[in-house]
Protein backbone atom coordinates (compact mmCIF):
# COMPACT_ATOMS: atom_id res chain seq x y z
CA UNK A 1 0.00 0.00 0.00
CA UNK A 2 1.38 3.39 -1.04
CA UNK A 3 1.55 6.04 1.65
CA UNK A 4 0.79 9.60 0.64
CA UNK A 5 3.31 12.07 2.10
CA UNK A 6 2.22 15.12 4.06
CA UNK A 7 2.15 18.54 2.46
CA UNK A 8 3.11 21.85 4.05
CA UNK A 9 0.74 24.82 3.95
CA UNK A 10 1.96 28.27 5.11
CA UNK A 11 -0.08 29.27 8.15
CA UNK A 12 -0.05 31.41 11.29
CA UNK A 13 -1.57 30.48 14.64
CA UNK A 14 -2.98 33.60 16.30
CA UNK A 15 -4.91 34.57 19.37
CA UNK A 16 -7.57 37.18 18.76
CA UNK A 17 -9.51 38.34 21.81
CA UNK A 18 -10.53 35.28 23.82
CA UNK A 19 -10.26 32.92 20.82
CA UNK A 20 -7.45 31.47 18.74
CA UNK A 21 -7.31 29.98 15.28
CA UNK A 22 -5.26 29.03 12.24
CA UNK A 23 -4.90 31.86 9.70
CA UNK A 24 -4.11 31.45 6.00
CA UNK A 25 -3.51 33.83 3.13
CA UNK A 26 -5.81 32.72 0.31
CA UNK A 27 -2.85 32.64 -2.09
CA UNK A 28 -1.03 30.13 0.13
CA UNK A 29 -3.78 27.51 0.12
CA UNK A 30 -3.45 24.48 -2.17
CA UNK A 31 -5.09 25.29 -5.50
CA UNK A 32 -8.06 22.98 -4.89
CA UNK A 33 -8.85 24.82 -1.64
CA UNK A 34 -8.71 28.36 -3.04
CA UNK A 35 -12.40 28.19 -3.91
CA UNK A 36 -15.29 27.44 -1.54
CA UNK A 37 -16.33 23.82 -1.55
CA UNK A 38 -15.66 20.32 -0.34
CA UNK A 39 -11.87 20.43 -0.84
CA UNK A 40 -11.49 23.59 1.24
CA UNK A 41 -13.71 22.24 4.01
CA UNK A 42 -11.86 18.92 4.09
CA UNK A 43 -8.48 20.68 4.30
CA UNK A 44 -9.57 22.93 7.17
CA UNK A 45 -11.14 20.06 9.08
CA UNK A 46 -7.91 18.05 8.79
CA UNK A 47 -5.84 21.04 9.91
CA UNK A 48 -7.98 21.46 13.02
CA UNK A 49 -8.34 17.73 13.70
CA UNK A 50 -12.01 17.15 12.96
CA UNK A 51 -14.28 15.29 12.99
CA UNK A 52 -13.08 13.75 16.24
CA UNK A 53 -15.48 11.32 17.95
CA UNK A 54 -13.31 11.63 21.08
CA UNK A 55 -14.00 15.37 21.13
CA UNK A 56 -10.34 16.27 21.78
CA UNK A 57 -8.89 17.26 18.35
CA UNK A 58 -5.63 15.58 19.37
CA UNK A 59 -4.57 15.08 15.73
CA UNK A 60 -4.87 18.73 14.75
CA UNK A 61 -4.45 22.35 15.75
CA UNK A 62 -7.86 22.69 17.40
CA UNK A 63 -8.29 22.98 21.14
CA UNK A 64 -11.59 21.07 21.42
CA UNK A 65 -13.66 24.13 22.37
CA UNK A 66 -15.75 26.51 20.28
CA UNK A 67 -13.14 29.23 20.98
CA UNK A 68 -10.26 27.19 19.55
CA UNK A 69 -11.80 25.26 16.63
CA UNK A 70 -11.47 28.13 14.20
CA UNK A 71 -9.95 28.95 10.81
CA UNK A 72 -9.50 32.20 8.89
CA UNK A 73 -8.71 32.96 5.24
CA UNK A 74 -7.54 36.47 4.32
CA UNK A 75 -6.95 37.96 0.86
CA UNK A 76 -6.31 41.36 -0.68
CA UNK A 77 -9.65 42.98 -1.38
CA UNK A 78 -10.87 44.08 -4.79
CA UNK A 79 -13.63 46.10 -3.14
CA UNK A 80 -13.35 49.89 -3.11
CA UNK A 81 -12.24 51.36 0.21
CA UNK A 82 -11.28 47.98 1.68
CA UNK A 83 -7.85 46.51 2.26
CA UNK A 84 -8.61 42.83 2.80
CA UNK A 85 -11.39 40.25 2.60
CA UNK A 86 -11.77 38.10 5.71
CA UNK A 87 -13.54 34.73 5.67
CA UNK A 88 -14.14 32.78 8.88
CA UNK A 89 -14.78 29.05 9.19
CA UNK A 90 -16.03 27.53 12.46
CA UNK A 91 -14.98 23.88 12.41
CA UNK A 92 -17.28 21.41 14.12
CA UNK A 93 -15.39 19.38 16.71
CA UNK A 94 -17.10 16.01 16.37
CA UNK A 95 -18.98 16.30 13.07
CA UNK A 96 -17.72 16.61 9.50
CA UNK A 97 -18.61 20.17 8.55
CA UNK A 98 -17.36 23.74 8.58
CA UNK A 99 -19.94 26.40 9.45
CA UNK A 100 -19.54 29.52 7.27
CA UNK A 101 -22.76 31.21 8.44
CA UNK A 102 -21.26 33.89 10.67
CA UNK A 103 -18.26 35.92 11.76
CA UNK A 104 -15.92 35.53 14.73
CA UNK A 105 -15.70 38.87 16.49
CA UNK A 106 -12.75 37.86 18.64
CA UNK A 107 -10.60 36.70 15.72
CA UNK A 108 -11.57 39.90 13.89
CA UNK A 109 -9.00 41.58 16.15
CA UNK A 110 -6.23 39.44 14.65
CA UNK A 111 -7.13 39.99 10.98
CA UNK A 112 -5.56 43.46 10.72
CA UNK A 113 -2.26 42.44 12.35
CA UNK A 114 -2.09 39.27 10.21
CA UNK A 115 -2.85 41.20 7.02
CA UNK A 116 -0.17 43.82 7.72
CA UNK A 117 2.48 41.23 8.60
CA UNK A 118 1.51 39.14 5.57
CA UNK A 119 1.94 41.97 3.08
CA UNK A 120 -1.77 42.20 2.25
CA UNK A 121 -2.09 45.88 3.23
CA UNK A 122 -0.57 48.65 1.12
CA UNK A 123 2.66 49.66 2.93
CA UNK A 124 1.74 53.32 2.32
CA UNK A 125 -1.17 52.83 4.75
CA UNK A 126 1.10 51.60 7.54
CA UNK A 127 2.87 54.38 9.49
CA UNK A 128 6.34 53.95 10.96
CA UNK A 129 4.82 54.64 14.37
CA UNK A 130 1.22 55.16 15.37
CA UNK A 131 -1.95 53.39 14.29
CA UNK A 132 -2.72 51.64 11.02
CA UNK A 133 -6.36 51.70 9.95
CA UNK A 134 -7.18 48.38 8.28
CA UNK A 135 -10.46 48.27 6.36
CA UNK A 136 -11.77 44.71 6.47
CA UNK A 137 -14.58 43.22 4.39
CA UNK A 138 -16.18 40.47 6.48
CA UNK A 139 -17.14 38.11 3.67
CA UNK A 140 -19.34 35.74 5.71
CA UNK A 141 -21.89 38.40 6.56
CA UNK A 142 -21.11 41.14 4.03
CA UNK A 143 -20.10 43.83 6.52
CA UNK A 144 -17.21 46.23 7.08
CA UNK A 145 -14.94 46.12 10.13
CA UNK A 146 -12.41 48.86 10.82
CA UNK A 147 -9.40 47.71 12.85
CA UNK A 148 -7.09 50.19 14.58
CA UNK A 149 -3.76 48.35 14.76
CA UNK A 150 -0.86 49.78 16.82
CA UNK A 151 2.42 50.09 14.91
CA UNK A 152 5.92 50.54 16.34
CA UNK A 153 8.95 50.98 14.09
CA UNK A 154 6.95 49.90 11.05
CA UNK A 155 5.78 46.61 12.56
CA UNK A 156 2.63 45.47 14.33
CA UNK A 157 2.95 46.07 18.07
CA UNK A 158 1.68 42.99 19.89
CA UNK A 159 2.84 43.55 23.47
CA UNK A 160 1.27 46.14 25.72
CA UNK A 161 -0.67 46.73 28.92
CA UNK A 162 -4.24 46.25 27.68
CA UNK A 163 -5.96 43.65 29.85
CA UNK A 164 -8.87 41.55 28.64
CA UNK A 165 -10.86 39.32 30.99
CA UNK A 166 -10.56 35.76 29.71
CA UNK A 167 -6.96 36.29 28.54
CA UNK A 168 -4.18 35.70 31.07
CA UNK A 169 -1.53 38.12 29.81
CA UNK A 170 -1.79 41.79 28.79
CA UNK A 171 -1.12 42.81 25.18
CA UNK A 172 -1.52 45.75 22.81
CA UNK A 173 -5.04 47.09 22.34
CA UNK A 174 -6.76 46.70 18.96
CA UNK A 175 -9.93 48.76 18.67
CA UNK A 176 -12.61 47.40 16.35
CA UNK A 177 -15.49 49.25 14.73
CA UNK A 178 -18.24 47.00 13.38
CA UNK A 179 -19.89 49.23 10.80
CA UNK A 180 -23.66 49.03 10.21
CA UNK A 181 -23.80 45.74 12.13
CA UNK A 182 -27.50 45.01 11.60
CA UNK A 183 -28.47 42.31 9.11
CA UNK A 184 -29.24 43.11 5.52
CA UNK A 185 -27.96 39.96 3.86
CA UNK A 186 -30.32 37.44 2.28
CA UNK A 187 -31.75 34.87 4.65
CA UNK A 188 -31.28 36.98 7.76
CA UNK A 189 -34.74 38.46 7.83
CA UNK A 190 -33.48 41.63 6.18
CA UNK A 191 -33.46 43.75 9.32
CA UNK A 192 -32.00 44.13 12.78
CA UNK A 193 -35.13 42.60 14.30
CA UNK A 194 -36.22 39.86 11.86
CA UNK A 195 -39.59 39.38 13.58
CA UNK A 196 -40.29 43.12 13.54
CA UNK A 197 -40.47 43.25 17.34
CA UNK A 198 -38.09 44.29 20.11
CA UNK A 199 -39.53 41.52 22.30
CA UNK A 200 -41.44 38.43 21.19
CA UNK A 201 -43.25 35.57 22.89
CA UNK A 202 -41.25 32.51 21.83
CA UNK A 203 -43.01 29.17 22.28
CA UNK A 204 -40.47 26.49 23.17
CA UNK A 205 -41.71 22.90 23.57
CA UNK A 206 -40.87 21.50 26.99
CA UNK A 207 -39.96 24.96 28.30
CA UNK A 208 -43.01 27.15 27.75
CA UNK A 209 -43.47 30.64 26.36
CA UNK A 210 -40.42 32.84 26.85
CA UNK A 211 -39.97 36.56 26.33
CA UNK A 212 -37.18 36.88 23.75
CA UNK A 213 -35.29 39.63 21.96
CA UNK A 214 -34.18 38.20 18.61
CA UNK A 215 -31.64 40.47 16.99
CA UNK A 216 -29.28 40.23 14.06
CA UNK A 217 -26.39 42.57 14.77
CA UNK A 218 -22.85 41.24 14.78
CA UNK A 219 -24.35 37.75 14.79
CA UNK A 220 -27.95 36.52 15.02
CA UNK A 221 -28.67 36.18 18.75
CA UNK A 222 -31.66 35.10 20.83
CA UNK A 223 -31.74 36.80 24.24
CA UNK A 224 -33.98 35.44 27.00
CA UNK A 225 -34.34 36.34 30.68
CA UNK A 226 -32.22 34.30 33.08
CA UNK A 227 -34.91 33.89 35.72
CA UNK A 228 -37.42 32.61 33.15
CA UNK A 229 -35.26 29.53 32.60
CA UNK A 230 -34.14 29.02 36.19
CA UNK A 231 -30.82 30.87 36.19
CA UNK A 232 -29.37 33.98 37.85
CA UNK A 233 -26.91 35.19 35.20
CA UNK A 234 -23.94 34.45 37.48
CA UNK A 235 -23.36 30.91 36.20
CA UNK A 236 -19.91 29.66 35.18
CA UNK A 237 -19.23 26.92 32.64
CA UNK A 238 -19.41 24.00 35.08
CA UNK A 239 -22.95 24.90 36.11
CA UNK A 240 -24.28 24.35 32.60
CA UNK A 241 -21.83 22.42 30.43
CA UNK A 242 -22.12 19.27 32.54
CA UNK A 243 -25.92 19.42 32.53
CA UNK A 244 -27.20 17.53 29.48
CA UNK A 245 -30.80 18.55 30.18
CA UNK A 246 -29.86 22.25 30.28
CA UNK A 247 -27.84 22.02 27.07
CA UNK A 248 -30.74 20.30 25.33
CA UNK A 249 -33.06 23.08 26.53
CA UNK A 250 -30.78 25.79 25.12
CA UNK A 251 -30.53 23.95 21.80
CA UNK A 252 -34.33 23.75 21.63
CA UNK A 253 -34.57 27.49 22.34
CA UNK A 254 -31.95 28.12 19.65
CA UNK A 255 -33.75 26.00 17.07
CA UNK A 256 -37.16 27.61 17.62
CA UNK A 257 -35.61 31.08 17.69
CA UNK A 258 -33.78 30.40 14.43
CA UNK A 259 -37.06 29.36 12.84
CA UNK A 260 -38.79 32.57 14.00
CA UNK A 261 -35.87 34.65 12.73
CA UNK A 262 -36.08 33.08 9.28
CA UNK A 263 -32.57 31.64 9.51
CA UNK A 264 -33.81 28.10 8.88
CA UNK A 265 -36.90 26.73 7.13
CA UNK A 266 -37.28 23.59 9.25
CA UNK A 267 -36.08 22.57 12.71
CA UNK A 268 -33.87 19.76 11.42
CA UNK A 269 -31.62 22.29 9.64
CA UNK A 270 -30.25 23.51 12.98
CA UNK A 271 -28.02 20.44 13.40
CA UNK A 272 -25.65 21.63 10.66
CA UNK A 273 -25.89 25.30 11.63
CA UNK A 274 -24.03 25.25 14.93
CA UNK A 275 -22.39 28.68 14.70
CA UNK A 276 -25.56 30.74 14.26
CA UNK A 277 -27.76 31.85 15.86
CA UNK A 278 -26.38 32.24 19.35
CA UNK A 279 -28.54 31.97 22.45
CA UNK A 280 -27.89 34.06 25.57
CA UNK A 281 -29.58 34.93 28.84
CA UNK A 282 -29.53 38.26 30.68
CA UNK A 283 -30.07 39.42 34.24
CA UNK A 284 -29.79 42.55 36.34
CA UNK A 285 -26.42 42.98 38.12
CA UNK A 286 -25.57 41.05 41.29
CA UNK A 287 -22.22 40.22 42.88
CA UNK A 288 -20.45 37.10 41.63
CA UNK A 289 -17.00 35.55 41.37
CA UNK A 290 -15.50 35.10 37.89
CA UNK A 291 -13.86 31.87 36.78
CA UNK A 292 -10.43 33.33 37.59
CA UNK A 293 -11.49 33.91 41.22
CA UNK A 294 -11.80 37.65 40.64
CA UNK A 295 -14.83 39.21 42.40
CA UNK A 296 -17.21 41.16 40.17
CA UNK A 297 -19.39 43.59 42.12
CA UNK A 298 -22.91 44.48 41.03
CA UNK A 299 -21.80 48.10 40.86
CA UNK A 300 -19.06 47.25 38.36
CA UNK A 301 -21.45 46.25 35.58
CA UNK A 302 -24.71 47.34 33.96
CA UNK A 303 -26.04 43.81 33.45
CA UNK A 304 -25.06 40.14 33.40
CA UNK A 305 -24.94 38.06 30.22
CA UNK A 306 -24.16 34.41 29.63
CA UNK A 307 -24.02 33.03 26.08
CA UNK A 308 -23.69 29.62 24.48
CA UNK A 309 -21.49 28.83 21.50
CA UNK A 310 -21.44 25.53 19.60
CA UNK A 311 -23.70 23.98 22.21
CA UNK A 312 -21.73 24.97 25.32
CA UNK A 313 -21.61 27.96 27.68
CA UNK A 314 -18.80 30.21 26.47
CA UNK A 315 -15.88 30.78 28.84
CA UNK A 316 -16.11 34.55 28.33
CA UNK A 317 -18.09 36.21 25.53
CA UNK A 318 -18.04 35.82 21.77
CA UNK A 319 -17.00 39.09 20.13
CA UNK A 320 -19.91 39.05 17.72
CA UNK A 321 -22.33 38.40 20.59
CA UNK A 322 -20.80 41.40 22.36
CA UNK A 323 -21.75 43.46 19.29
CA UNK A 324 -25.30 42.12 19.61
CA UNK A 325 -25.30 42.99 23.33
CA UNK A 326 -24.07 46.53 22.72
CA UNK A 327 -26.55 47.06 19.92
CA UNK A 328 -29.53 45.67 21.84
CA UNK A 329 -28.55 47.65 24.95
CA UNK A 330 -28.64 50.88 22.94
CA UNK A 331 -32.27 50.34 21.91
CA UNK A 332 -34.85 51.07 24.63
CA UNK A 333 -37.24 48.21 25.29
CA UNK A 334 -35.14 45.17 24.39
CA UNK A 335 -34.54 42.59 27.11
CA UNK A 336 -30.86 43.53 27.11
CA UNK A 337 -31.67 47.21 27.52
CA UNK A 338 -34.19 46.52 30.30
CA UNK A 339 -31.72 44.31 32.20
CA UNK A 340 -29.27 47.22 32.05
CA UNK A 341 -31.82 49.58 33.57
CA UNK A 342 -33.60 50.83 30.44
CA UNK A 343 -33.36 54.19 28.69
CA UNK A 344 -31.04 55.33 25.94
CA UNK A 345 -27.39 54.42 26.37
CA UNK A 346 -24.33 54.46 24.12
CA UNK A 347 -22.26 51.88 26.00
CA UNK A 348 -22.63 49.11 28.56
CA UNK A 349 -20.26 47.08 30.67
CA UNK A 350 -21.57 43.57 31.15
CA UNK A 351 -20.47 40.71 33.36
CA UNK A 352 -19.56 37.36 31.76
CA UNK A 353 -18.02 34.16 33.20
CA UNK A 354 -14.43 35.45 32.95
CA UNK A 355 -15.07 39.02 34.12
CA UNK A 356 -16.40 42.14 32.40
CA UNK A 357 -16.41 43.74 28.96
CA UNK A 358 -17.40 47.19 27.74
CA UNK A 359 -19.03 47.59 24.34
CA UNK A 360 -20.53 50.67 22.73
CA UNK A 361 -23.04 51.25 19.95
CA UNK A 362 -24.43 54.30 18.18
CA UNK A 363 -28.19 53.96 17.68
CA UNK A 364 -30.69 56.42 16.19
CA UNK A 365 -34.31 56.27 15.10
CA UNK A 366 -35.06 56.93 11.43
CA UNK A 367 -38.65 56.84 10.26
CA UNK A 368 -39.70 54.92 13.34
CA UNK A 369 -37.01 52.27 12.79
CA UNK A 370 -33.91 51.86 14.94
CA UNK A 371 -30.63 52.13 13.03
CA UNK A 372 -27.21 51.33 14.48
CA UNK A 373 -24.34 52.92 12.57
CA UNK A 374 -21.57 51.07 14.37
CA UNK A 375 -20.59 49.06 17.42
CA UNK A 376 -17.21 49.54 19.07
CA UNK A 377 -15.09 47.38 21.34
CA UNK A 378 -11.45 46.70 22.12
CA UNK A 379 -9.64 43.37 22.00
CA UNK A 380 -6.02 42.31 21.62
CA UNK A 381 -4.20 39.89 19.32
CA UNK A 382 -0.89 38.07 19.24
CA UNK A 383 0.96 35.69 16.94
CA UNK A 384 1.51 32.39 18.77
CA UNK A 385 3.29 30.47 16.02
CA UNK A 386 4.03 30.90 12.34
CA UNK A 387 5.42 28.68 9.61
CA UNK A 388 3.65 25.71 8.03
CA UNK A 389 0.89 23.40 9.07
CA UNK A 390 1.14 19.85 7.75
CA UNK A 391 -1.69 17.65 6.50
CA UNK A 392 -1.72 14.33 4.64
CA UNK A 393 -1.67 14.95 0.90
CA UNK A 394 -4.88 13.00 0.36
CA UNK A 395 -6.82 14.78 3.10
CA UNK A 396 -8.75 17.03 0.71
Descriptions of predicted regions:
Residues 1-396:
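A glycine-rich beta-to-alpha transition motif near the start of alpha/beta enzyme domains, typified by
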